[in-house]
Each structure stands twice: as structure tokens, then as C-alpha cells.
């Protein structure tokens, strides 16, 4: 039982990860490193990028992707890859933590179906802005936002990185509960040394 284990095994999922560097990719990378350094074990599932070799202290499962960089700035993953789902399931995570409400959360839900473990979703940014930038036509934009909110609503717990992010999520039609879980920093507390 995950609640009685001293250390958890966590599956982190996101639609961006190095070589793509953005705020969410950095957050996922930091989560994985910190968990792996002593809080438990972690596996990261992300879309494949041509020519990328991963060398981290934790396993990275890359799944098939297609180039959508001109549209959204990164590659879109195919979340139904049997090989990737098998590899992530074999890790036997106690919890799945998705950081993107699109393909990563679809994959998280497929994995939850197999493993019967909870999915936590973190809403990092205002995805409606990205949708409106990538998709023309109000009806298509509204449909995409509704699908995004439905995907988020299917998660067992929803975190937002700020009260403003939570308000944005509500404005999109999300009616469920959420917890404000601010992104952490790894600087020591207290006065900054003069060095």
C-alpha cells in the first residue's frame, strides 16, 4: 500500500522535456531529480525527440511523437504506445503525476486504467492562450478548451501553481476542487550571503 511505504515510486509525465527547455520541463526535471535523490524513485514519460540520448539518474521512457513544433512549439506524443505504456507500467508507480493536460494526461489516464493508482495533475500555465494562438476559429478553440477541461476533470487530484492559475482554470469551465501547490525553489532560506 502506497500510504504505508516509506518512499514512493512516482511516474512523471509531460509533453516537454530536454532538449526542449521551458518552465514546465524544468519543473518536471527538478521533481524527478529531487525524488530520485532520496524521496523515492521516479520514471519520466515524455515524447521522443530525434537524436536525443538521456543520461539521468532516473529512467526516461520516450514514446513516439510527431513534429508539431511550428504549431505549438514542441513535438506531440502518441500516448497510446504499447511499448511505452508497458515500460511505465513495469515501473509500478504508486502515483502518476501529469504536468500537461493534453497527451501526457491522456497517457496518465491510460496508465491509471492498467495500474489502479491515482493521477495528480498540475496546471502550470494558461493553456487557453496557447490554444487560441495555435487554433483559429472560436468554435474549434472552445471545443479544444472543453476537451482540455474534461481531461483535467478526470484526474484524481488537481494542483495549480498559483491562485491566479486556479482562477484561470475556473474561467475555462473547470468545476472541480484544486490545491494551490506553488513551484518550489532549491535556494536555502534566510539572508543571501555576500559571496
Residue ranges and their predicted role:
Residues 69-98, 103-110, 114, 142, ...:
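An amphipathic, basic-hydrophobic alpha-helix
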Residues 100, 125, 162-163:
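Helix N-cap/beta->alpha junction signal
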Residues 153-162, 179:
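A short beta-strand/loop micro-motif in the catalytic core of glycosyltransferases
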Residues 1-62:
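N-terminal subdomain of nucleotide-sugar transferases
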Residues 118-120, 128-150, 187, 192:
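Nucleotide-sugar donor phosphate/pyrophosphate-binding loop at the beta->alpha transition
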Residues 48, 164, 184:
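Carbohydrate-associated surface elements
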Amino acid at each position: 500500500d502506497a500510504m504505508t511505504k516509506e518512499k514512493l515510486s512516482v511516474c512523471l509525465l509531460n509533453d516537454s522535456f530536454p532538449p526542449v527547455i521551458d518552465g514546465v520541463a524544468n519543473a518536471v526535471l527538478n521533481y524527478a531529480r529531487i525524488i530520485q535523490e532520496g524521496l523515492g524513485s521516479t520514471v519520466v514519460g515524455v515524447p521522443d525527440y530525434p537524436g536525443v540520448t538521456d543520461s539521468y539518474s532516473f529512467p526516461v521512457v520516450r514514446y513516439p511523437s510527431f513534429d508539431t513544433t511550428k504549431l505549438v512549439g514542441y513535438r506531440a506524443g502518441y500516448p497510446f504506445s504499447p511499448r511505452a505504456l508497458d515500460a511505465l507500467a513495469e515501473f509500478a508507480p504508486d502515483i502518476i503525476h501529469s504536468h500537461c493536460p493534453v497527451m501526457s494526461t491522456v497517457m496518465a489516464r491510460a496508465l491509471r486504467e492498467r495500474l489502479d493508482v491515482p493521477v495528480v495533475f498540475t496546471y502550470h500555465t494558461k493553456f487557453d492562450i496557447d490554444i487560441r494562438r495555435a487554433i483559429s476559429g472560436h468554435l474549434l478553440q472552445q471545443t479544444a478548451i472543453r476537451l482540455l477541461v474534461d481531461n483535467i476533470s478526470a484526474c484524481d487530484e488537481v494542483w495549480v501553481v498559483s491562485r491566479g492559475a486556479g482562477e484561470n482554470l475556473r474561467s475555462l469551465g473547470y468545476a472541480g476542487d484544486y490545491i494551490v501547490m506553488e513551484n518550489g525553489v532549491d535556494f536555502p532560506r534566510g539572508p543571501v550571503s555576500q559571496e
